A protein has these predicted regions:
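Conserved ABC ATPase signature
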Residues: 1, 5, 341-345, 349
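A short, proline-enriched helix->beta-strand linker immediately N-terminal to the Walker B motif
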Residues: 16-20, 360-364
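P-loop NTP-binding/switch modules centered on Walker-like glycine-rich loops
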Residues: 23, 27, 31-113, 367, ...
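Short catalytic/signature loops enriched in Gly
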Residues: 84-195, 208-213, 428-511
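Conserved ABC nucleotide-binding domain
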Residues: 90, 110, 321, 327-343, ...
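Conserved ABC ATPase "signature" region
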Residues: 101-102, 270, 319-336, 445-446
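Conserved ABC transporter NBD signature motif
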Residues: 262-270, 282
Length: 511
């Protein structure tokens, strides 16, 4: 069974006793956005049909905006704010809620830093006195660390635990800080920039073996003929559902996986023809930040040893002379962290260590493979601010591999949408997100729950992504496509340019 089917089975088990209350604890966290949309639609239909109540536990604020009637915001074991969904998103009252919503990457925050919350959630075994959020609060005043806030009515049917709304302490409260908007960033070069990396017809097929003799009986077509241009100094995003081949493509570009066919050129040098020592100088210039900040760091090494791993791998005997402290400061960590071990750090701090390791060899090109997917919203904001700042200061070129379309809108300049091993649409973020052309891109964008969008048109796709071992004949998307035509079942659509920076593979646009 697929992930979506398994979740349906779990829902059926939960409904077997006809409950009055269904508690859905992160029911869609491990699912792709299109399957997530199906599950949310199913739960909502069941709620209406049976009259049961649903308690949704989630960290996805877009999902909350889309599905919930009322919202309770928790921090350090306390319900700090509770109100109608529209009221929370329109007029949040608790400083934690305010910062949480401001830390979500969206298109309208594209040219300014996200609101990151300093510090960490306190240990549940040693909560501080007074307000538990006070050590991290930008509005905290003298009373906050000393007195536990009361549960107050900030507005009709809007409850909040905060001294800012307590008449007894309001006179002592600090006024909200004046925020100075950042100047818009210069537009990223489009089309005219020098190509740092150029991929043509890249294929990565994995053999499927069977029997005692391990005969090859089929091939998994993980990447099946992809063209990709990454201009220097530009941030490119690869998006798509799980299993579409985006991570495999990223590894093939770095030559961590050898392409079955096609070519990958880095600054005009063909990488697929290089081996061993000839490839090593290019490995230094191309680095990767992995998805898992826990599994990607060796627990037996100190942070200083981890950061200089790349230097030692490239034969730099003077790796100890590299200023590890400065590198750690570059990614927002204290220099004293060099002597500590990974288990002493939070997920966000570990991801910063991974970024420092990648930067130690001074790369030109950085692949970020779901680099923030394992992090909380506020920690994600810190990492996105860091990547944005490093891109400006060091002139880095990024390839973001992600399913988080809010991140793409906030950070990327160009985007390529993948489906079952092939790119179906590509262009600037403004073009693709502003007016998606391919039916799959339209469904993908419609399925993403957003904190800043209401009344969106929903496009529910049937079924799951087909197997890359036996992809459908013709256009791979046709079994799920709401716009399917007879020719879609017969041949794969050719690439159709719509502008100098935009292409789509769909017969709807092929003359």
């Amino acid at each position: 069974l697929s992930g979506g089917q398994r979740q349906r089975v779990m829902i059926a088990i939960a409904l077997a006793c006809r409950p009055a209350l269904l508690i859905a604890d992160e029911p869609t966290t491990a699912l792709d956005v299109t399957v997530q949309d199906q599950i949310l639609e199913l739960i909502d239909d069941l709620r209406r049909d049976t009259g049961m109540a649903v308690l949704l536990i989630t960290h996805n604020l877009g999902l909350v905006r889309q599905t919930a009637t009322r919202v309770g915001v928790m921090y350090a074991g306390k319900l700090v704010e509770e109100a109608a969904t529209a009221s929370i998103f329109r007029d949040p009252r608790h400083p934690y809620t305010v910062k949480l919503l401001e830390s979500v990457p969206t298109a309208h925050r594209r040219h300014r830093a996200l609101a990151a919350i300093p510090g960490f959630v306190p240990d549940a075994s040693a909560y501080p006195d007074g307000c538990r959020f006070a050590p991290r609060c930008h509005r905290a005043f003298s009373v906050c660390p000393l007195v536990v806030p009361r549960n107050l009515a900030a507005a009709p049917k809007h409850r909040v635990e905060c001294h800012l709304y307590d008449p007894e302490f309001q006179a002592r409260a600090l006024p909200p800080p004046v925020e100075i908007a950042e100047a818009p960033a210069a537009a990223a070069p489009q089309g005219t920039a020098e190509s740092l990396l150029l991929a043509r017809g890249v294929e990565v097929h994995f053999p499927v073996t069977a029997g005692v003799l391990r005969r090859v009986v089929a091939r998994v077509k993980a990447v099946d003929g992809v063209d990709l241009v990454v201009p220097r100094g530009v941030s490119v995003a690869l998006v798509g559902e799980s299993g579409c081949g985006k991570t495999t493509l990223g590894k093939a570009l770095l030559q961590l996986i050898r392409p079955t066919a096609g070519s990958v050129a880095f600054q005009g040098t063909e990488l697929t023809a290089l081996r061993g020592r000839d490839l090593k100088p290019f490995r230094r210039r191309m680095q990767i930040v992995f998805q898992d900040p826990y599994g990607s760091l060796n627990p037996r090494l100190t942070v200083g040893e981890i950061v200089t791993e790349g230097l030692r791998a490239h034969g730099r005997e003077d790796s100890s002379a590299v200023d590890v402290g400065e590198l750690l400061k570059t990614v927002g960590l204290d220099a004293s962290a060099a002597s500590r071990y990974p288990h002493e750090f939070s997920g966000g701090q570990r991801q910063r260590i991974g970024i420092a390791r990648a930067l130690a060899v001074r790369p030109d090109f950085l692949v970020c493979d779901e680099a923030t997917s394992a992090l909380d919203v506020s920690v994600q904001a810190q990492i996105l601010n860091l990547l944005r700042d490093l891109g400006k200061r060091l002139g880095l070129t990024y390839l973001f591999i992600t399913h988080d379309l809010g991140l793409v809108e906030y950070l990327a300049d160009l985007v390529s949408v993948m489906y079952l091993g092939r790119v179906v649409e590509s262009g600037t973020v403004e073009e693709v997100f502003g007016a998606p052309k391919h039916p799959y891109t339209q469904a993908l964008l419609a399925a993403v729950p957003r904190v800043d969008a209401t009344g969106r048109k929903r496009i529910l796709l049937g079924g799951d992504v087909p197997s890359p071992v036996h992809p459908p004949a013709g256009c791979h998307f046709h079994p799920r496509c709401p716009e399917v035509m007879p020719q879609c079942r017969e041949s794969y659509p050719p690439e159709t340019p719509l502008s100098t920076s935009r292409c789509v593979r769909c017969f709807l646009y092929h003359s």
